[in-house]
Amino acid sequence: MVRTADTVRSMIDLHCHMLPGIDDGAPDLATALAMARIAVADGIHTVACTPHIYPGLYENDAAGIRRAIADFRLALAEAGIELTLVEGADTHMAPDLVQSLKAGRVPTLAGSRYFLYEPPHHVAPPRLEEQVFALLANGYVPVITHPERLTWIESHYALFPRMAKAGAWLQLTAGAITGRFGKRPQYWSQKLMDEGPVHLIASDAHSAGRRSPVISEARERAARQLGEAESWALVRDRPQAILDDLSPDKVLAPPLRGKALGWWARLMSRR
């Protein structure tokens, strides 16, 4: 791909498992450095290091994540890799999540009001919407990660536009948009983008291989579906707004095109 002035080092990836040896992402420093090089080559200048916080499986916390980021920053500098790191976590549902956020045990994205919120992958949780509303009521903006990849999205699809309308944000995975996760996640990512609102695209990278930190191709796909301006909002403008901790009402909202126009757009794109 030949990069223009707009694409060179202009993107922000707010969901990445790059920190070495802390979850199911990069297993070691060599892999983490390889991932960082891939991100830079793709045009990414800032990455949120977002390891899992999953009680009983990945017992990470804000203090440990910050220490890991500090160590990795030193490694990047020694390797001559220019990549800005900010803190975050891929936070799974937990009954005490609001309290953990308030106590600082769970980090938000770069210390903002926004944080990554991961629903269970295989089972629709009965109290998901209730917890999202509680988080919003306490001043947090949950960024719901990869809804397009959840096995239960078909039977609960309306839940996601409803939560987004209430104030939650939705983040799609770049690889789902480009088809790396198969036809089903690609279909749901297209449907969500068609009908809105989708706020962010991120890599959810876990390796330097199939799940690497690459989002440029997904941005190009989004540009064909939504237009250039909105595609850049997904990977640059709204991520920057999160880093700046802007109130959601100060951020350009994603377009709400509705079902009819969305399906018409998809029909026309196949011609």
Model-identified regions with their sequence ranges:
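An N-terminally biased module of ancient metal coordination in phosphate/nucleic-acid-related enzymes
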Residues: 1-80
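Active-site gating loops and adjacent loop-to-helix segments of metal-dependent hydrolytic enzymes
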Residues: 4-10, 48-50, 102-112, 167, ...
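Hydrophobic "anchor" residues on beta-strands that sit immediately upstream
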Residues: 9-13, 47, 114, 142, ...
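Active-site beta-loop-alpha junctions enriched in small/polar residues
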Residues: 17-19, 52-53, 88-92, 120-122, ...
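Non-catalytic positions within long, well-ordered alpha-helices that form the structural scaffold/packing
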Residues: 40, 136, 193-194
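Extended substrate/RNA-proximal surfaces in nucleic-acid metabolism proteins
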Residues: 58-171, 253-271
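Short acidic/histidine-rich active-site segments
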Residues: 197-213
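Mid-to-C-terminal alpha-helical segments outside catalytic/metal-binding sites
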Residues: 220-271
